[in-house]
């Protein structure tokens, strides 16, 4: 199973994808510090240029990653979260939501969906991405409906708000997860495994041990 990644940052999500059996073919990342980190730690990855998803979406084709149309298993990314944050709500102009210029990469993300037609699409963002007065959930669903009409695909979009602590991560981290499946199937969301017995941060840190601490490089 192969995946193309958008907005990798420090590749935390990719560790989970790799543990689930995915191979990362290429990634797009705008932040220069994150790009340097990826090149140092992921020298087998293709770091796609230019580092701008809007520009890349206009030119990138499946063949550039050695794929045929519809051959990509998963297109995965996290569109900019600032337009859907509580900080944006408290700002002078309040929530701009999809009208915020920082939300525009989402359209480029969806353009890449139409270009690659992956079997699965995964997006992660703040809870207000799919709930509240500035939610873009309906806009995203409408865009997938348009993709279906133009490409004769059958994407079905599902969303949920999940807390990482409910699945064994020693941190309360609620995030909106959006999944689209090309085969016309609804997402079956996993049942929480640690909802009543969360892992404590001390337990996780204590288990590391001094011998597992990596040596600094660079």
What are these regions (language model features)?
Residues 28, 79, 124-125:
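Glycine-rich, histidine-containing beta strand-loop boundary motifs that form or position
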Residues 40-78, 181:
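Short, structured active-site "lid" loops
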Residues 32, 55, 81, 127-128:
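Short, glycine/acidic-enriched loop or turn micro-motifs at the edges of active sites
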């Amino acid at each position: 199973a192969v995946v193309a990644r958008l907005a990798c940052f420090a590749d935390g999500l990719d560790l989970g994808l790799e543990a689930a059996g995915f191979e990362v073919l290429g990634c797009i990342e705008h932040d220069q510090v994150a790009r340097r980190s990826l090149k140092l730690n992921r020298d087998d990855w293709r770091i796609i240029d230019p580092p701008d998803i809007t520009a890349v979406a206009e030119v990138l084709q499946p063949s550039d990653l050695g794929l045929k149309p519809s051959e990509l298993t998963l297109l995965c990314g996290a569109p900019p979260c600032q337009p859907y944050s509580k900080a944006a709500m408290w700002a002078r102009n309040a929530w701009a939501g999809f009208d915020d210029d920082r939300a525009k990469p989402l359209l480029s993300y969806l353009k890449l969906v139409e270009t690659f037609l992956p079997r699965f699409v995964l997006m992660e963002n703040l809870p207000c991405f799919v709930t509240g007065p500035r939610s873009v959930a309906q806009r995203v669903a409408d865009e997938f409906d348009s993709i279906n009409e133009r490409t004769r695909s059958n994407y079905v979009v599902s969303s949920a708000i999940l807390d990482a602590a409910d699945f064994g991560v020693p941190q309360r981290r609620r995030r909106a997860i959006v999944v689209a499946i090309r085969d016309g199937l609804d997402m079956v969301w996993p049942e929480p495994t640690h909802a009543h017995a969360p892992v404590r941060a001390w337990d996780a840190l204590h288990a590391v041990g001094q011998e597992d601490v990596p040596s600094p490089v660079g």
